[in-house]
Curated annotation (Swiss-Prot):
Its EC number is 4.2.1.9. InterPro entries: DHAD_IlvD/Edd, Dihydro-acid_dehy_C, DihydroxyA_deHydtase, DiOHA_6PGluconate_deHydtase_CS, ILV_EDD_C, ILV_EDD_N, IlvD/EDD_N. Binds 1 [2Fe-2S] cluster per subunit. This cluster acts as a Lewis acid cofactor. Functions in the biosynthesis of branched-chain amino acids. Catalyzes the dehydration of (2R,3R)-2,3-dihydroxy-3-methylpentanoate (2,3-dihydroxy-3-methylvalerate) into 2-oxo-3-methylpentanoate (2-oxo-3-methylvalerate) and of (2R)-2,3-dihydroxy-3-methylbutanoate (2,3-dihydroxyisovalerate) into 2-oxo-3-methylbutanoate (2-oxoisovalerate), the penultimate precursor to L-isoleucine and L-valine, respectively. It comes from Mycobacterium ulcerans (strain Agy99). This is Dihydroxy-acid dehydratase. The gene is ilvD.
Length: 564
């Protein structure tokens, strides 16, 4: 088979008399005559100093470039943004989190297209930067490799009773709720705050970043075994160099992102997310990435796969372990091999190694599940996957609940309705949210929020207040990957689009049936329908800027909250 053209695009800026000015610019950044015959590789990084999630990317980008050079290419690094959900949580800043996913994808596309780069290595560490980079790869359909920054190690807090406790960032959110109810001292909150982030890396549990890193590996877009090692682990530098080499080999073989991101590959990613009991945000992001790859993927696919794939991983937020423990027992390949052997994974999917999933796993030969961090298929934590898709009179287009960790299937209670998260937090702090309540937080969807904010402040506070198993929370917004408890998000249609959630009133009875996959408001249908007459949505919160544009473009959470 003849080798593909390794400069399918960069000839536009390097070849011919009329490109003298472009070559002159490239000489100024270090290129010499012989470099103009090399493939030009964009090394896109979301490195910044705002959050620990991305701190390793500066180091890793250097190793990626070494790998590109070693393989005969020429790397050109550029940056994009990243928003820290941990810092932006619980205030106005969270409106800007999900839109950052689109900004990242758009900015990478813009640079890659404008500069005619031949391929890319995409580096990310924060929750929205991972899917944003993968969306860009799918949209561009060039030779691309994704590289994760790696997760943070757990911290150890020394509490006032003399005990020591392993903690992650989620413990801080829950400590706030406990302290506000008098269940924890301010000194212990301070001890937890100081311990939760002992260094660089993304939040350590199976929260959104680690879930999406695992999904990227299962999707075939990152090197096998690269998702689990911590950010500080020097194996990451090796994966970075190999990623730089891999993108050149993909160019030589003529393999592009959509050759890898097939429907079967997305089914593999969903299966791994289900086995891990990963973040509900993976539903939103995988739908969006599939949209960019021109792959038809729906909420029904998550239901279908989740009904077959058991929940195997005892990981936070519901379990005991973090990503570094997953790494200790062999990483994501252990999960993938377990699923492959059971016929729950497509082994013939192509990956960035140029080989198939099955071939990669045969070469790695991962160990069997250890039985603690990851259980065997014959002894799952739950018989079905850790995420369930719901439908019903309150969510005709769908809703999402994380079932990993739930110990009951049915919750029926009385609605307490709040237009926005802040009002719900105030009610919790006042002690007026009690056992049996169904807390409904609306006008927090993609358009209505805008930005579909994560509700970690309220869910963490509810758990910290000791109500995690006694209160059901519903929203057209999202939840953090660190959320625990009875929490249903992504309710669609959202309130601003006249979805049923807009017409729920205090005192309505609401029923969640996880096994039946239903979410219903039990109000008499004619009465409920009468409430919908003459509906007028609230005026847009933002009249100018990025969110004003976002509201005009963004679609339903049921299709990934994509813009166009």
């Amino acid at each position: 088979m003849p080798e593909a053209d390794i400069k399918p695009r960069s000839r536009d800026v390097t070849d011919g008399l009329e490109k003298a000015a472009a070559r002159g610019m490239l000489r100024a950044v270090g290129m010499v005559d012989e470099d103009f015959a090399k493939a030009q590789i964009g090394v896109a990084s979301s490195w910044n100093e705002i959050t620990p999630c991305n701190l390793s990317l500066d180091r890793l980008a250097k190793s990626v470039k070494e790998g590109v050079f070693a393989a005969g290419g020429y790397p050109l690094e550029f940056g994009t943004i990243s928003v820290s959900d941990g810092i932006s949580m619980g205030h106005e800043g969270m409106h800007f989190s999900l839109v950052s996913r689109e900004v990242i994808a758009d900015s990478v596309e813009t640079v890659m297209q404008a500069e005619r780069l031949d391929g890319s290595v995409l580096l990310a560490g924060c929750d929205k930067s991972l899917p944003g980079m993968l969306m860009a790869a799918a949209r561009l359909d060039l030779a691309s490799v994704f590289l994760y920054a790696g997760s943070i190690l757990p911290g150890v807090a020394k509490l006032s009773d003399g005990s020591e406790r392993e903690v992650t960032i989620i413990d801080a959110f829950e400590a706030v709720g406990a302290c506000s109810r008098g269940l924890m001292s301010r000194a212990d909150v301070d001890a937890i705050e100081r311990a939760i982030c002992p260094g660089e890396g993304a939040c350590g549990g199976m929260y959104t970043a680690n879930t999406m890193a695992s999904a990227a590996e299962a999707l075939g877009m990152s090197l096998p075994g690269s998702a689990a090692p911590p950010a500080t682990d020097r194996r990451r530098d090796g994966f970075a160099r190999q990623s730089g080499q891999a993108v050149i080999e993909l160019l030589r073989q003529g393999i592009t992102a959509r050759d890898i991101m097939t429907r079967e590959a997305f089914e593999n990613a969903i299966a791994v997310v289900m086995a891990f009991g990963g973040s509900t945000n993976a539903v939103l992001h995988l739908l969006a990435i599939a949209h960019e790859a021109n792959v038809e993927l729906t909420l029904d696919d998550f239901s279908r796969i989740g009904s077959k794939v058991p929940h195997l991983a005892d990981v936070k937020p519901f379990g005991r372990h973090v990503m570094s423990h997953v790494d200790h027992i062999g990483g994501v390949p252990v999960v993938m091999k377990t699923l492959l052997d059971a016929g729950l994974l497509h082994g013939d999917c192509l990956t960035v190694t140029g080989r198939t999933v099955a071939e990669n796993l045969e070469a790695i030969a991962p160990p069997d599940p250890d039985g603690k961090v990851l259980r065997a298929l014959i002894n799952p934590i739950h018989a079905t996957g850790g995420i369930t898709i719901l439908r019903g009179s309150l969510a005709p287009e769908g809703a999402v609940v994380k079932t990993a960790g739930l110990d009951t299937d049915v919750f029926e209670g009385t609605a307490r309705v709040f237009d926005g998260e802040r009002a719900a937090l105030d009610a919790l702090e006042d002690g007026t949210i009690t056992h049996g309540d169904v807390v409904v937080i609306r006008y927090e969807g993609p358009k209505g929020g805008p930005g579909m904010r994560e509700m970690l402040a309220i869910t963490g506070a509810i758990k910290g207040a000791g109500l995690g198993k006694d209160v059901l929370l519903l929203t057209d917004g999202r939840f953090s990957g660190g959320t625990t408890g009875f929490c249903v998000g992504h309710i669609a249609p959202e309130a601003v689009d006249a979805g049923p959630i807009a017409f729920v009133r205090d005192g309505d009875r609401i029923r969640l049936d996880v096994a039946g996959r239903t979410l219903d408001v039990l109000t008499d249908p004619p009465e409920f329908a009468a409430r919908q007459q003459n509906f007028t949505p609230p005026a847009p919160r933002y009249k100018t800027g990025v969110l004003a544009k976002y509201v005009k473009l963004v679609g339903s959470a049921a299709i990934g909250a994509v813009c166009g």
